C-alpha cells in the first residue's frame, strides 16, 4: 500500500513538473512566433527577459545598446514582446500628440511614492494629457515669474562654495580637489527642491547628503533599472504584500521614506488654513487643482527624476570640455568676450545664453555624447498592429527607444558622429542647425511624452556651465580617466576630481 502511495505521489510530482515544462514551452513559442523575423542579440531575448536584465544590471547598458543597430538593423528584439529602435521617425510617430500608443508598464517603476500614481506613471494618453495640462504652466515657467531667480540663488551658492573652499589663487595656492560628481548633484537637488517646495534642502550650504537620499538612490539604481526592464521583478516589487512589509514609509530615517516625509511636511504647510500663496511650482500645482496628495507625489517625482539626470548632463558637458583643449579655449574666449562686451548679466540669463552660439553647441554636443536618460520608454502598439521597415509589428508589442544609438547616428550627425566635436553645430546654416538640435532633444522625449522638466534642465545647464567657466578654470586630476562611469538607465559618474583655479578678469558678482 505504501509503495502504491509513493508511486502515486511520484507520478503526481512528475505530472506537475511536466505540465509546468509544457506550459513554459508553449508560452515561449507563442511569445517567440509573432516577432520571429526581427533579429535579436541573443536567443534568450526571443522568449525571456534574461538578456535584457543581464545587460541592464551589468552597468554597461549604454555601450551595449549603442552598438545594437550597427549589428542587427533598425529594429532589434530585446524581449518576448519588446523591440528597440533608433529610428527617429518611428520614435516621433509613436509619441506624437495624436498617437494612440499608450505607455508600457515599464513606466510604473517611476512610482517613487509606490502607493500613488504621478504624471509619469499614467499609462493611457487621455489621463496623462490631463495631468500634463495641469502641471505644464509650472514646468514651463509660465506660472513662475521667479523661476530663473530660484535657479540663480542656488547658482550663487554653488559659485560661493567653489570659491571659498576649492578655488586656488595667489593667496590660497593649495586648495582641496573638488568632486564634481558630488557637488553637481548637490546643486541640482537644491535647485529642484527650491522650485518644487519654495525652499532648498541645503545640500550645497551644508555640503552633505541630506537624509542620505542621494547615496541610497545611487545604490538602488542598478536594482531599480533592472526591475523596470524585467516585468516579473517589477510586478513583485510593486505588489501590495511586498510594499506592506518592505515598502518605504514616511517614518523611515533615510532614503525614499524620509523624502516622502519631507514632501508631506512642505506640501502640508502650503495646504494649511493660514498658508500664503507663492509663485513657485507648488503654488502653480495648487492653483491648477492638484490636491495635497497629488502635490506630494509630483514633488517627490520631480526630486528623483530631476536631480541625477540634470547633474549627469552638467558633468558630461564639463568633462568633455575639460578633455578637449581646443573646445575649452574656444568656449572660454566666447565667455570672456561676452562679459567684456557687456552682453550678459551676472548671473547670465537664459535668453542671453541662447545667443552664445558656441556655448549652445557645447551643451548640445555634451548631451549627445552622454544623454541624461537611457531608459527604454516603451510605447505599446495599438489594435491592428503596424508596419515598420517592411516588418509587421503586432498589437501589444512594446516599441522601446534607443537613445544611446540614436545620438550616435551618422545619418543625423555626420560621418564623425562618434567624435566629440561641438563645431558640427556651428558649421550648419540656421534651419539645419535647428534640425540637428531637435534631434538631440529627442533625448528628452517627443510630442505628448516630452519630458516636462526639459525647460528647467536647459536653464540649469546653460547657467551653470557659463558661470562656472566665467569664474574658474577647471583641470581634471586624471584626464586619461576623468571618472568612474556606470550606466543603469542613467549615467552614474563618481570620483570626478577637479582642480579649481580662479579665472582672471571675469569676476563673478
From Swiss-Prot:
Pathway: Hormone biosynthesis. InterPro entries: Cyt_P450, Cyt_P450_E_grp-I, Cyt_P450_sf, Cytochrome_P450_monoxygenase. It comes from the Eukaryota. Glycans are attached at residues 402, 462. GO terms for biological process: abscisic acid biosynthetic process. Disruption phenotype: Impairs the production of abscisic acid (ABA). Residues 1-31 form the signal peptide. Keywords: Glycoprotein, Heme, Iron, Metal-binding, Monooxygenase, Oxidoreductase, Signal, Virulence. GO terms for molecular function: heme binding; iron ion binding; monooxygenase activity; oxidoreductase activity, acting on paired donors, with incorporation or reduction of molecular oxygen. Induction: Expression is persistently induced 90 minutes after the addition of the ABA precursor mevalonic acid (MVA) to the medium. Its cofactor is heme. Its EC number is 1.-.-.-. Pfam families: p450. Heme binds at residue 451. The keyword Transferase does not apply. Belongs to the cytochrome P450 family. Cytochrome P450 monooxygenase; part of the gene cluster that mediates the biosynthesis of abscisic acid (ABA), a phytohormone that acts antagonistically toward salicylic acid (SA), jasmonic acid (JA) and ethylene (ETH) signaling, to impede plant defense responses. The first step of the pathway catalyzes the reaction from farnesyl diphosphate to alpha-ionylideneethane performed by the alpha-ionylideneethane synthase aba3 via a three-step reaction mechanism involving 2 neutral intermediates, beta-farnesene and allofarnesene. This is Cytochrome P450 monooxygenase aba1. It comes from Botryotinia fuckeliana (strain B05.10) (Noble rot fungus).
Amino acid at each position: 500500500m505504501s509503495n502504491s502511495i509513493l508511486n502515486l505521489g511520484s507520478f503526481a510530482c512528475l505530472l506537475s513538473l511536466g505540465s509546468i515544462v509544457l506550459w513554459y514551452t508553449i508560452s515561449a513559442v507563442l511569445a517567440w512566433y509573432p516577432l520571429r523575423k526581427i533579429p535579436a542579440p541573443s536567443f534568450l531575448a526571443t522568449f525571456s527577459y534574461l538578456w535584457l536584465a543581464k545587460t541592464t544590471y551589468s552597468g554597461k547598458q549604454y555601450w551595449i545598446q549603442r552598438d545594437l543597430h550597427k549589428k542587427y538593423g533598425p529594429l532589434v528584439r530585446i524581449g518576448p514582446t519588446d523591440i528597440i529602435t533608433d529610428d527617429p521617425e518611428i520614435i516621433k510617430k509613436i509619441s506624437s500628440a495624436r498617437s494612440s500608443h499608450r505607455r508600457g508598464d515599464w513606466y510604473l517603476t517611476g512610482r517613487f511614492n509606490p502607493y500613488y500614481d504621478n504624471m509619469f506613471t499614467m499609462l493611457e494618453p487621455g489621463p496623462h494629457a490631463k495631468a500634463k495640462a495641469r502641471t505644464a504652466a509650472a514646468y514651463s515657467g509660465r506660472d513662475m515669474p521667479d523661476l530663473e531667480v530660484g535657479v540663480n540663488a542656488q547658482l550663487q551658492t554653488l559659485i560661493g562654495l567653489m570659491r571659498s573652499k576649492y578655488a586656488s589663487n595667489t593667496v590660497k595656492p593649495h586648495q582641496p580637489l573638488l568632486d564634481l560628481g558630488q557637488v553637481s548633484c548637490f546643486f541640482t537637488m537644491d535647485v529642484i527642491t527650491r522650485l518644487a517646495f519654495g525652499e532648498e534642502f541645503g545640500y550645497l550650504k551644508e555640503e552633505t547628503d541630506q537624509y542620505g537620499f542621494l547615496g541610497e538612490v545611487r545604490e538602488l539604481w542598478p536594482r531599480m533599472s533592472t526591475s523596470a526592464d524585467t516585468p516579473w521583478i517589477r510586478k513583485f516589487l510593486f505588489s501590495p504584500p511586498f510594499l506592506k512589509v518592505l515598502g518605504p514609509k514616511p517614518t523611515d530615517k533615510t532614503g525614499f521614506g524620509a523624502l516622502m516625509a519631507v514632501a508631506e511636511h512642505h506640501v502640508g504647510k502650503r495646504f494649511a488654513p493660514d498658508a500664503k500663496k507663492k509663485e513657485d511650482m507648488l503654488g502653480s500645482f495648487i492653483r491648477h487643482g492638484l490636491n495635497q496628495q497629488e502635490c506630494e507625489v509630483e514633488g517627490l517625482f520631480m526630486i528623483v527624476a530631476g536631480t541625477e539626470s540634470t547633474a549627469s548632463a552638467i558633468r558630461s558637458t564639463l568633462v568633455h570640455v575639460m578633455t578637449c583643449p581646443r573646445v575649452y579655449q574656444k568656449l572660454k574666449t566666447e565667455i570672456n568676450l561676452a562679459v567684456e562686451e557687456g552682453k550678459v548679466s551676472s548671473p547670465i540669463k537664459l535668453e542671453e545664453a541662447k545667443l552664445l552660439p558656441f556655448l549652445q553647441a557645447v551643451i548640445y554636443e555634451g548631451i549627445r555624447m552622454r544623454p541624461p536618460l537611457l531608459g527604454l520608454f516603451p510605447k505599446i502598439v495599438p489594435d491592428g498592429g503596424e508596419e515598420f521597415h517592411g516588418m509587421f509589428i503586432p498589437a501589444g508589442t512594446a516599441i522601446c527607444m534607443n537613445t544611446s544609438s540614436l545620438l550616435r547616428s551618422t545619418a543625423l550627425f555626420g560621418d564623425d558622429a562618434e567624435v566629440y566635436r561641438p563645431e558640427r553645430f556651428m558649421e550648419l546654416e540656421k534651419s539645419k542647425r535647428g534640425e540637428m538640435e531637435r534631434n538631440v532633444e529627442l533625448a528628452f522625449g517627443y510630442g505628448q511624452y516630452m519630458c516636462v522638466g526639459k525647460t528647467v534642465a536647459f536653464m540649469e545647464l546653460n547657467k551653470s556651465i557659463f558661470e562656472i567657466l566665467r569664474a574658474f578654470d577647471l583641470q581634471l586630476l586624471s584626464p586619461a580617466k576623468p571618472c568612474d562611469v556606470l550606466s543603469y538607465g542613467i549615467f552614474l559618474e563618481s570620483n570626478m576630481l577637479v582642480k579649481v583655479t580662479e579665472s582672471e578678469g571675469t569676476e563673478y558678482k
